[in-house]
Regions:
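Generic long, charged, amphipathic alpha-helical segments
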Residues: 221-236
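Single conserved hydrophobic/aromatic residue that forms the stacking wall/gate
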Residues: 235-245
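Adenylate-forming
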Residues: 29, 213, 234-235
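Glycine-/acidic-rich phosphate or pyrophosphate-binding loops and their flanking alpha/beta elements
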Residues: 8-20, 42-44, 149-160, 169-215
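Thiamine diphosphate
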Residues: 1-164, 169
Length: 245
């Protein structure tokens, strides 16, 4: 049996920016002294004149990105989720969300999976914060394949997008035939007894949980909701039945 390939979604983020950068000269990347960790350093190496390190000043970085977008550029502003959504929330809200500017925020090291980085860096509030901003699209891809497509979808979307990536390498369960769409859920596994809804790295965990439940005679359905906003309520309701938990 072949070993499951594992890749961190932040790796996909950086590599896809380079891919897009080759086709779209208006794409620029901003960082806050974390290019090596957020994996945007590969973009800096390929396009040094289109990468801007704003230093440890995330709030200012968001305002710079906002200004760039008004001049026709498509900025991807990147930092850890704790800083992109937490420290810079006011600037994201007022300078990007309120005027509905075409800025993409790439937030890495999200959730508690950053482990040894400590509680101060374990951002679990970013979903709530970013969803509260009118017009902000919020996406949390589950694996390398979905992350690459999500970055491309964010570029093609006219408006603010918050992309959430993890630090850890996670199993790649999508194949090249998978097509990501903003606002659309995905039925990963069919099941008739219980439904498990997840996103990000928890989708792979949900798949493994479904296997464990199967050993106990429980047929679990797994749904991936990568788009947190706008969420696919239609997709979720389609799987509601009196028999399902």
């Amino acid at each position: 049996m072949s070993e499951v390939k594992k890749i961190a979604t932040r790796e996909a983020f950086g590599e896809t920016l380079v891919e897009l950068g080759k086709k779209h000269p208006e794409l620029v990347v901003l960082d806050a002294d974390l290019a090596a960790a957020t994996k945007t350093a590969v973009f800096k190496k390929s396009f040094p004149d289109r990468h801007f390190d704003c230093g440890i000043a995330e709030a200012n970085m968001m305002c710079v990105a906002a200004g760039m977008s008004t001049m026709g550029l498509v900025p991807f502003a990147s930092s850890f989720a704790m800083f992109a959504a937490g420290r810079a929330f006011e600037q994201v809200r007022n300078s990007i969300g309120y005027p509905h500017l075409n800025v993409k925020i790439g937030a890495t090291h999200a959730g508690i999976s950053v482990g040894e980085d400590g509680a101060s860096h374990q951002c679990c509030e970013d979903f709530a914060l970013m969803r509260s901003i009118p017009g902000m699209v919020v996406i949390c891809p589950a694996d390398d394949v979905e992350a690459r497509q999500a970055v491309k979808a964010a570029y093609n979307y006219e408006g603010p997008v918050y992309l959430r990536f993890g630090r850890l390498a996670v199993p790649v369960f999508h194949d090249d035939n998978y097509k990501f769409e903003i606002g659309k859920g995905e039925l990963v596994k069919e099941g008739k007894d219980v439904t498990i809804i997840a996103n990000g790295l928890m989708v792979a965990e949900a798949i493994e949980s479904a296997k464990t439940l199967a050993e106990q005679g429980i047929d679990a359905e797994v749904i991936n909701i990568a788009t947190i906003k706008p969420v696919s309520y239609t997709h979720l309701r389609a799987h509601e039945t009196p028999e399902h938990l």
